[in-house]
């Protein structure tokens, strides 16, 4: 049917394992398909059938944050774990967040973790912890995710809220707003994306498109 319509590419929104707090944009495993949608074998068959009809497959990559159910975040709850640095943690008091930034879903962008006595950043739901792109190991792991799907025949990636991946490292108070000017189109966003392009997107021939949250034309 899609072939007869002249469709030559299909963009699939997140189908990864997820608690579904945000319609799958809270990813708990980047390389596993939620049983609700099927299996990796089903995906491979989809790719095979699509390519036989000249239809390319584009996947949604949610790389600004993960679900707090992701194995990385579960490990990060231990302050001594190397995964602690996969996320953005800051000191504060139980009732006093590190700054006044607001979540796009309402309320503070910081959630207190009592056991480790620090806050973690979540620009969206509290169940969506922001990844620390300043950590090269995080970037390396995300490249592996892209490679995994490229190996399965994916042709392109749609990068969710990709212009939020670089935050002002000072994490200053925003005296005139909700903080978005300090994390939108941040200081290293272009650098990070150039690195991904050099190391993965170009070598694998992946088409990419980025969602630019809070960016005006």
What is each PLM-predicted segment?
Residues 1-147, 151, 164-215:
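Acidic/aromatic-lined carbohydrate-recognition and catalytic surfaces
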Residues 10, 157-159:
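Hydrophobic residues within beta-strands of alpha/beta enzymes
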Residues 154:
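Conserved protein kinase catalytic-loop anchor
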